[in-house]
Structure formats: structure tokens, C-alpha cells
Amino acid sequence: MMTDPIADMLTRIRNAVRVERPFVDIPASRVKRGLADVLKREGFIWDWKEEKLEEEPVGYLRLELKYGPNGERVIQSIRRISKPGRRLYSRSKELKPVLGGLGIRIISTSKGVISDREARRDKIGGEVLCEVS
């Protein structure tokens, strides 16, 4: 049994980027779709789509990873912040830019999963899921 599916998703992305895979497959869920959507909006991945295999009860998200023109990684680091054993919540005023605005934090809010920039703009706080740079 998996205790932290979001950490599993982030680890799969981190491992795929390290070996320069063009895509990564991840078991689907609503929160993971939200994470993938934020990563696409913020320019860390090219695209994502959901695929369903006939023999599998759960669909998969296929994330198309993004690399620079010379093969450099767009995602330099991706790490889990709030964990099942230690949840971390933050108000919008407490959300400071990551690496001077070069990175993002992904927040789970009452409005769905959004980036820290959107949370500051809309003045919404929530659970800080992860940090990407």
C-alpha cells in the first residue's frame, strides 16, 4: 500500500528527468491531474494526457517532460513539502517567491491545486504540496 501518492509522483518525475526520458507515466488521481496542470501552466512540462488501459482499473497520466534546446533540464529540483506525517499550511501572505521567482510552490486550496503565484494574486492560502525549480 502506498502511503504518499504525491511523493510517488514527484519521485517518478525526478527519476525520469535524471535519465532524460521524454515522458513519464503516473497512476491518475484528481490531485495529480491538478499538479500536472500547474506544471504545464508554469512551463515545467510540455503537456499531459490521461490514458486508460482496458485491463487496469485506474487510468494513467502521461506527462511529456520538457528539456532545453541543448538537452538541459527544465525541472532542476522537485521536492515534497507537506507530508502525511507533517502537514504544512500557509497563508497567501506567507508564500514568498521560490528562487527569486524562478521556481514555484504548488498549493492545494479550496479553489483547487494552484501555483503560489496564483495563490498570492487571489489571496488564497492552503496546503503547500511541493516546490519545483
Curated annotation (Swiss-Prot):
An annotated Gene Ontology molecular function: rRNA binding
Entry keywords, A to Z: Ribonucleoprotein, Ribosomal protein, RNA-binding, rRNA-binding
GO (cellular component) term, any one: cytosolic small ribosomal subunit
HAMAP family assigned to the protein according to its UniProt record, in alphabetical order: Ribosomal_uS8_B
Its biological purpose: One of the primary rRNA binding proteins, it binds directly to 16S rRNA central domain where it helps coordinate assembly of the platform of the 30S subunit.
NCBIfam families: PRK00136.1
Stated name of the protein: Small ribosomal subunit protein uS8
Phylogenetic lineage: Bacteria, Pseudomonadati, Planctomycetota, Planctomycetia, Pirellulales
Gene from which the chain derives: rpsH
